[in-house]
Swiss-Prot record:
It comes from Bacillus cereus (strain ATCC 10987 / NRS 248). This is Cell cycle protein GpsB. One of its GO terms (cellular component) is cytoplasm. NCBIfam families: DivI1A_domain, PRK14127.1. The gene is gpsB. Gene3D superfamilies: 6.10.250.660. Divisome component that associates with the complex late in its assembly, after the Z-ring is formed, and is dependent on DivIC and PBP2B for its recruitment to the divisome. Together with EzrA, is a key component of the system that regulates PBP1 localization during cell cycle progression. Its main role could be the removal of PBP1 from the cell pole after pole maturation is completed. Also contributes to the recruitment of PBP1 to the division complex. Not essential for septum formation.
Length: 111
């Protein structure tokens, strides 16, 4: 796990003491830099903890869904039977009726 690989904490960074030599570092500059590191480190730690909690929650939800899926009885899937489709509109019906009348009565008119 990642927490096993982390060797420093924000507290370790804050309490770190550096020895100064004759021409050593500028203590104020190092302190400012360490403060920035501490803030970032704390932000990363907070984000890491939130992600761990989210990961645990998502794992629980996944297990609950798996359990619910195994408890649902498997029902055979029924394919819908094709029903005849009647999409005739009134105009289509009137045209067909008119054609039938012409066919029936039109032949009688010419006899």
């Amino acid at each position: 796990m990642i927490s096993d690989k982390i060797k420093l904490t924000a507290k370790d960074i804050l309490e770190k003491e550096f020895k100064t030599g004759m021409r050593g570092y500028q203590q104020e500059e190092v302190d400012k830099f360490l403060d920035m590191i501490i803030k970032d480190y704390e932000a990363f730690h907070k984000e890491f903890e939130q992600l761990k909690q989210q990961n645990a929650r998502l794992k629980r939800e996944l297990e609950e869904q798996k359990l619910a899926a195994t408890q649902v009885p498997q029902q055979p899937v029924q394919t819908p039977v094709a029903q005849p489709v009647y999409n005739n509109t009134n105009t289509d019906i009137l045209k067909r009726l008119s054609n039938l009348e012409k066919a029936v009565f039109g032949s009688k008119l010419y006899e």
